UniProtKB/Swiss-Prot annotation:
GO terms for cellular component: cytosol. Coiled coil: none annotated. GO terms for molecular function: nucleotide binding. The keyword S-adenosyl-L-methionine does not apply. This is Nucleotide-binding protein Bpro_1596. It comes from the Bacteria. The lineage of its organism: Bacteria, Pseudomonadati, Pseudomonadota, Betaproteobacteria, Burkholderiales.
Amino acid sequence: MPSFDTVLETDMVKVKNAVENTSKEIGTRFDFKGTAASIELKDKDITLVGDSDFQIDQINDVLRNKLTKAGVDIRFLDVGKIEKIGGDKVKQVTKVRDGIETEQAKKIQQLIKGSKMKVQAAIQEGKVRVTGAKRDDLQAAMALIRADMKDLPLSFDNFRD
């Protein structure tokens, strides 16, 4: 039976390079001299530290430019709130999405069930496997998912005939 997987995968090497390039630019830019501005990547969390909300926004802009140049969709970023930390500093933790969350996977599954297509969706550890009798049905399901889930940079892999 033909099938495909709907996944949400980030190229972490490109993200790491973008964070390192952002850190270098922060170190050389005149408006960041003598400030607490910094950026750090740990696992799938990017931590931005600055003296003010404006500085955090500036670092975010630099990071987004670097990610876009590297070919990473910025919809992979789940931007957190800006928090005050000691000594007139602020920080923001941005999570890099990797894998479809259960809630989003259920939305995809309900979308497919509600469409009355002759395909089935099964949630499997951070991805949704869609199976159907015909290749055309699967391609229609892909189009439906792409059209409805615009806020997620979903990709489709493991297409089997």
